[in-house]
Amino acid sequence: MDGVGIVTTRFYEWSQCLHLESGAQLGSLTIAYETYGELNAAGNNAILVLHALTGNAHIAGRNFPDERYPGWWDPLVGPGRALDTRRYFIVCANVLGSCYGTTGPASINPATGKPYGMDFPAITIRDMVRAQKILLDYLGVKRLVAAIGGSMGGMQVLEWGFLYPQMLDAIIPIATCGRTTPMQIAFHHVQREAIYADPDWQGGNYYGTAGPRRGLALARQIGIITYKSDPSWNMKFGRNLVDPRKYFQLEGQFEVESYLAYQGRKLVDRFDANSYLYLTKAVDLHDVSQGRGSYNEVWRDFPCPCLGIGISSDFLFPPYQVQEIVRMINDGGGHARYAEIDSPYGHDAFLIEFNQLAAIIQPFLKELRPDLAA
């Protein structure tokens, strides 16, 4: 089956104030997004895909003919695929606070004519979702077949269920949690500390210079460790050395060390350090019960059917966290089911195990809206 071909990233300019959960506001907002398929006349065949921490709106196809890689969920999007563009209108927006076209710390502050830097206000997962709702209203989407996403994207999915349940047929959170744990917060803390410790961070006012490349690269390396599993490290690298002749030298590298350094360099070339700070903090602040009562009670009468998907080897978001969401929805009188990706690839499996994901998601979507699956 062919994919979606060449796609264009578009930009929506919202000229009104966006009021944030912190009480701060943004005077205007730009949202970068991509769409696939066609919105039907009723405006009710849309699926919203939410991306993870350093992701973007480019989930499928290529932005130009010789682009090296297609979008990050390309095998799932297109005619006849799990997110079937013959039936569904697929939308993905770059999140608020990121650096792929949506307003974030690297954007120009209209009050100063300079990048926001650390003057950018604190943002939360709920703020991201409210920005996405603005975009969907602009696009004419009246109802979503589903909101779906993994990791930080799964957090957005859950908040969609709390903020706009009347607009959803169902939610599909993947490899995520209802509130971040101390371990998850701890890993983000040391990643942010790596950026702060780089003198080139300059208090966040590094635009126009090289910026904190070493700090961001180290932060990424720490993050990469949490995205894998012990079996996946063993399968990929074992104890192999880059150069066995340097076995007893401090600068000698195991292949796993070389890989981490490479991943750090890759991110530095495509991501903004301040966005990394703001987005990891938004993840740390994630708690669906914040301002809504107790965590145990907030799931009572949850209005959206839920398909929660865990990953068997996930170290960062262990499957019990998705299982807990499903259990609490069901115990509260709602309707939820659980499925699991059986994979050695750890948290990254939702970006790798496309066949398993398709086998889980596709029948669920057809069951939700048989009128669209005919």
Swiss-Prot record:
This is Homoserine O-acetyltransferase. Homodimer. Transfers an acetyl group from acetyl-CoA to L-homoserine, forming acetyl-L-homoserine. Its EC number is 2.3.1.31. It comes from the Bacteria. One of its GO terms (molecular function) is homoserine O-acetyltransferase activity. GO terms for biological process: homoserine metabolic process; methionine biosynthetic process. It is found in: Cytoplasm. It holds the Pfam family Abhydrolase_1. It comes from Moorella thermoacetica (strain ATCC 39073 / JCM 9320). Its main location: cytoplasm. It catalyses: L-homoserine + acetyl-CoA = O-acetyl-L-homoserine + CoA. It is an enzyme of class 2 (transferase). The gene is metXA.
